[in-house]
Amino acid sequence: MKQIPMTVRGADKLREELDYLKGVRRPKIISDIADAREHGDLKENAEYHAAREQQGFCEGRIQEIEAKLSNAQVIDITKMPNNGRVIFGATVRVLNLNTEEEQNYRIVGDDEADFKQNLISVNSPIARGLIGKEVDDVVVIHTPGGEVEYEILSVEYV
């Protein structure tokens, strides 16, 4: 399988979720199934069927997280050489030359991306346009909303 780039923080969040699902959620669902079984006829037992459905969702998510972690290429940005170039995991401050607004973006893996928190996927048009560039470079990025011109103001490796 293809390796998935992921920050240390992203891998830690997935491990936390996996621990919660295995240590808290799964045992609770098993208990709910056992309680529902005690109510008799399983054919018309809505509690039983709901708990079994939750069990399916939980087990599916556990498998999904385990697969992602087994294929993850965890990249610790703090151990990367600081050469001033935009790379995976870097935090980039840019100036949108169309609107004169400054914006900070952190380039992360697909599963970590959250545009509202300025975490952009390494596969997003903005990240693809910025990767490999340096401070003071001006880049034109083709986004779904049209072309945007950015000047790179700073690159941090935190």
From Swiss-Prot:
It holds the Pfam family GreA_GreB. SUPFAM superfamilies: FKBP-like (SSF54534), GreA transcript cleavage protein, N-terminal domain (SSF46557). GO terms for biological process: DNA-templated transcription elongation; regulation of DNA-templated transcription elongation. Keywords: DNA-binding, Transcription, Transcription regulation. Gene3D superfamilies: Transcription elongation factor, GreA/GreB, C-terminal domain, Transcription elongation factor, GreA/GreB, N-terminal domain. The keyword Protein transport does not apply. It comes from the Bacteria. The keyword Disulfide bond does not apply. GO terms for molecular function: DNA binding; RNA polymerase binding. InterPro entries: GreA/GreB_C_sf, TF_GreA/GreB_CS, Tscrpt_elong_fac_GreA, Tscrpt_elong_fac_GreA/B, Tscrpt_elong_fac_GreA/B_C, Tscrpt_elong_fac_GreA/B_fam, Tscrpt_elong_fac_GreA/B_N, Tscrpt_elong_fac_GreA/B_N_sf. NCBIfam families: greA (TIGR01462), PRK00226.1-2 (NF001261), PRK00226.1-4 (NF001263), PRK00226.1-5 (NF001264). Belongs to the GreA/GreB family. Necessary for efficient RNA polymerase transcription elongation past template-encoded arresting sites. The arresting sites in DNA have the property of trapping a certain fraction of elongating RNA polymerases that pass through, resulting in locked ternary complexes. Cleavage of the nascent transcript by cleavage factors such as GreA or GreB allows the resumption of elongation from the new 3'terminus. GreA releases sequences of 2 to 3 nucleotides. This is Transcription elongation factor GreA. It comes from Yersinia pestis. The gene is greA.
